[in-house]
């Protein structure tokens, strides 16, 4: 004799709809969480880089006292940058591990809820959902396979309640090293391109009066290379230079005696200034100290002087040689002066 099964079938359909709605709600929550995480990561990029370089600059200023050579300054700056990057890497590693633990706990809660729903609705769905059970079983197996693969990739086979922020993450370290190397190579390529650019240098051979010449150099050339080329140009016109070598010449720029090992690039990238004008321009304009307010930074500069060291020793008590002094990268010139 046939039996009426209407109530059981209606209850099964209702439970099936509830499960579908629960799954849709979980998917929406996951999408919202991913979008929020992406927005937070994007908004923190600029802050992270600016805070990183501000901290390095502050540490460099506080740890540098007195006169320091250019090489020592560069070495100290590189060491501070590396130390700061290690600190940031540790903080980022701790944050990522915390997020992974939160996601793992959330998955455990969802799986527990699914098990409770399945145990309650099993008897009601048994009569009419034979085909649906097979489909759900297949979906459940796929989900378990995905979770197993994800667990293997993330290496989260340990107790999620244990703090593992101090442990190294080889994958992330390799990615950070790769990115750091790419940025270093990109920066070096850009600097090499700048150094290879050609500039025209206007200079004056000074023996009590000026004799102007021009020569083309590259921004990466040193003062010694420049003086060698200038000497080749001047020898045919000045007999006292025919037996002179580069080590006997001095280069005076904006009343500062420039050491031979410095390059034009050093002054260009740092926008260095001298006593009477900028050191980063090597073409010539009228005297910037007489045209307008000499305290305002200008691009105009004076022709650098090429001088025999013997001439300087004899005349260093007489103007203009009396104004000349050795270049010191730590000394700042706030105003341009004539005397």
Curated annotation (Swiss-Prot):
Q: Where is the composition biased (Acidic residues)?
A: 124-146
Where in or outside the cell?
Nucleus
Covalent cross-link site, Glycyl lysine isopeptide (Lys-Gly) (interchain with G-Cter in SUMO2): 100
Q: One Pfam family from the UniProt entry? A: XAP5
Query: Which tissue types show expression of this protein?
Result: Widely expressed in fetal and adult tissues. Mostly abundant in fetal brain, liver and kidney; in the adult, high levels were also observed in heart, skeletal muscle, spleen, thymus, prostate and small intestine. Expressed in fetal cerebellum and hypothalamus. Low expression is observed in fetal temporal lobe.
Q: Entry's InterPro entries?
A: FAM50A/XAP5_C, XAP5
**Motif Nuclear localization signal: residue span?**
152-155
On whether Transcription is a keyword of this UniProt record, the answer is no
Which GO terms fall under biological process for this protein? chromatin organization; mRNA processing; regulation of RNA splicing; RNA splicing; spermatogenesis
**Alphabetical keyword list:** Acetylation, Disease variant, Intellectual disability, Isopeptide bond, mRNA processing, mRNA splicing, Nucleus, Ubl conjugation
Q: Which GO terms describe its molecular function?
A: RNA binding
Membrane spanning residue stretches = none
Compositional bias (Basic and acidic residues): 168-177
Q: Which residues carry this modification: N-acetylalanine?
A: 2
* UniProt GO cellular component terms: nucleoplasm; nucleus
* Region annotation (Disordered) ranges: 1-31, 121-177
What highest taxon heads this organism's lineage? Eukaryota
Where would you say this protein principally sits, based on its record?
nucleus
- Clinical note on disease: Intellectual developmental disorder, X-linked, syndromic, Armfield type: An X-linked recessive disorder characterized by global developmental delay with impaired intellectual development, walking difficulties and poor or absent speech. Affected individuals display a distinctive phenotype characterized by postnatal growth retardation, variable head circumference with a prominent forehead and dysmorphic facial features, ocular abnormalities, and seizures.
Tell me, what does this protein do in biology?
A: Probably involved in the regulation of pre-mRNA splicing.
Tell me the protein family, please: Belongs to the FAM50 family.
Quaternary structure (record): Interacts with EFTUD2, a component of the spliceosome U5 complex. Interacts with DDX41, a component of the spliceosome C complex.
Q: What is this protein called?
A: Protein FAM50A
Q: Which organism is this entry from?
A: Homo sapiens
């Amino acid at each position: 004799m046939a039996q009426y099964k209407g109530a059981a079938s209606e209850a099964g359909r209702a439970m099936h709809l509830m499960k579908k709605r629960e799954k849709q709600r979980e998917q929406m929550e996951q999408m919202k969480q991913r979008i929020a995480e992406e927005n937070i990561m994007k908004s923190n990029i600029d802050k992270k880089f600016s805070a990183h370089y501000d901290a390095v600059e502050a540490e460099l200023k506080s740890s540098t006292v007195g006169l320091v050579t250019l090489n020592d300054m560069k070495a100290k700056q590189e060491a501070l940058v590396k130390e700061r990057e290690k600190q940031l890497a540790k903080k980022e590693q701790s944050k990522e591990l915390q997020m992974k633990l939160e996601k793992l706990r959330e998955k455990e809660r969802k799986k527990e809820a699914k098990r409770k729903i399945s145990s309650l609705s099993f008897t009601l769905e048994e009569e009419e959902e034979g085909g649906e059970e097979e489909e759900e079983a297949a979906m459940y197996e796929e989900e378990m396979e995905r979770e197993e693969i994800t667990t293997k990739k993330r290496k989260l086979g340990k107790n999620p309640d244990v703090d593992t922020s101090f442990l190294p993450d080889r994958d992330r370290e390799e990615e950070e090293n790769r990115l750091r190397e790419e940025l270093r190579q990109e920066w070096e390529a850009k600097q090499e391109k700048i150094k290879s650019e050609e500039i025209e240098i206007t200079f004056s051979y000074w023996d009590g009066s000026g004799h102007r010449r021009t020569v083309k150099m590259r921004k990466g050339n040193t003062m010694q290379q420049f003086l060698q080329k200038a000497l080749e140009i001047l020898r045919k016109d000045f007999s006292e230079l025919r037996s002179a070598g580069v080590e006997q010449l001095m280069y005076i720029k904006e009343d500062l005696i420039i050491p031979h090992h410095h390059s034009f690039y050093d002054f260009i990238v740092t926008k260095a200034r001298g006593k009477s004008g900028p050191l980063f321009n090597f073409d010539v304009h009228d005297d910037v100290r007489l045209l307008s307010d000499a305290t305002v930074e200008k691009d105009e500069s004076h022709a650098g002087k090429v001088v025999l060291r013997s001439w300087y020793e004899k005349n260093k008590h007489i103007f203009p040689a009396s104004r000349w002094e050795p270049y010191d990268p730590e000394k700042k010139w706030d105003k341009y002066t004539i005397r």
